[in-house]
Amino acid sequence: MSDSTLKPISIERVVTELKRLSEGRKSGQYAEDEYEHRFARMVGELRDRRIDGNRADIMTAFEGLRRDGFLDPGAWERLTKSLGLGPGRI
């Protein structure tokens, strides 16, 4: 039988994909509904596969994306809550 465990996704890959998604939305490449669909699919995949890193490293990377304008407040909240990284989570 094959191993059904999915390999975790690197923090660098997550950052790259979130930047690409944000740039596509800002440039008009993705309509709002297409962006929402892709964002939700990405979050689902991250929940299934996990991110390869500890909470501090992941949050540092996400904070950089927020600071640089790649994650708006709504996307930030959805991403961190969906991945269990919101305030008060361990």
Which positions does each model-derived feature cover?
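Acidic, Ser/Pro/Thr-rich low-complexity regulatory regions
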Residues: 1-90
